[in-house]
């Protein structure tokens, strides 16, 4: 699989081109220089007949401070790994010494480089392109990402570097044909198997609690750029690892600031965090063990509760003794009452303490999150629960009955109670949830009950 890297100074349109190729708004795009600070990696198919490519969007190459020096180093490292480099420039400006210097350094790597001159919005601006010939590029493509001008030609050029998919045999080439229904069953079973082995994990928390450091520790290499600057990571960075037979995808989300401090790009990041939680199976809520729990931590926990993710609470930067751990653990469950079912783990991304244990915990919580209870077993437990603690009567004093129960969804486990009423008092629902937790390992996952009167659609109890 070939790698195509997009490089250039901040605000020349790298993320916009990245998104155009992906055909979706994935990277956060802003007029603020240096919006994309981390290396983003996506696999994309440019044509059905071609193999997929790995598209890499790098941070802007501008030498201003320590953070951007790190970004620059990362971008150049990516260029070394890439098979094709798209070096983007702003067609509305002229190349300066710094830009020429970067381009010369890239040429020394011996990579095939396409110079992409962006913001050439019309034919009159084509003369601007000639200013960039002094860079000595082998190929120059004038484009306008915002006007979708010339992008198609650029993609066609990229395709020339992509190998074709290996030829596949037609069914007729086999001596024995396989019945269509068998193929469909096999495909369905394969999809189910893949689903059972895929976990999507969102790493969430407020700014500078160590989410990027935790991601790097989990993945085993420095993918997210780490800095003491608040909000260093803006875009989510997807990284996959294989652990104990499972494919785990980590998404390192932008830190959430207090609302009074949210401006411009942080608003995008907040929305992206919500989006990631919607798509994720498991949320890792990262809190700073040294700073302790603040109100914003609780609000972020509320987002997890809202989206009904499986959850693990992680205290990062932990270096205290066992006695302090138990005190802090008690405070965690006091402040996060609505996440009382979440396991709590103290880790150190810096030293690697409990990182492997966290990986194991992700798998365990996901198994609970996707668990299905056999109907016979579930009804046995519900019957036992109602015998131990009778159902409350309704407002009119009439008896409330549960005829039977069935789990109709997983992720999270969702159970329908078929009743003579379509509502169940919240206190009894809580009792049933706690009863089930004693019978089965549901740590890390919410359990949802819906009350359904015979003949009616599901409604949340």
From Swiss-Prot:
Residues annotated for GTP 1 binding in this entry: 8-15, 57-61, 118-121
Signal sequence extent: none
SUPFAM superfamilies reported for this sequence: P-loop containing nucleoside triphosphate hydrolases
Keywords tagged on the record: GTP-binding, Nucleotide-binding, Repeat, Ribosome biogenesis
Residue ranges of every copy of the EngA-type G domain listed in the record: 2-166, 199-370
SMART domains according to UniProt: RAS
GO biological process terms, semicolon-separated: ribosome biogenesis
Domain KH-like intervals: 371-455
Residues that hold GTP 2 according to the record: 205-212, 252-256, 316-319
GO MF term set: GTP binding; ribosome binding
Assembly description: Associates with the 50S ribosomal subunit.
Family: Belongs to the TRAFAC class TrmE-Era-EngA-EngB-Septin-like GTPase superfamily. EngA (Der) GTPase family.
HAMAP family in UniProt: GTPase_Der
Role played: GTPase that plays an essential role in the late steps of ribosome biogenesis.
Protein name according to UniProt: GTPase Der
Organism: Nautilia profundicola (strain ATCC BAA-1463 / DSM 18972 / AmH)
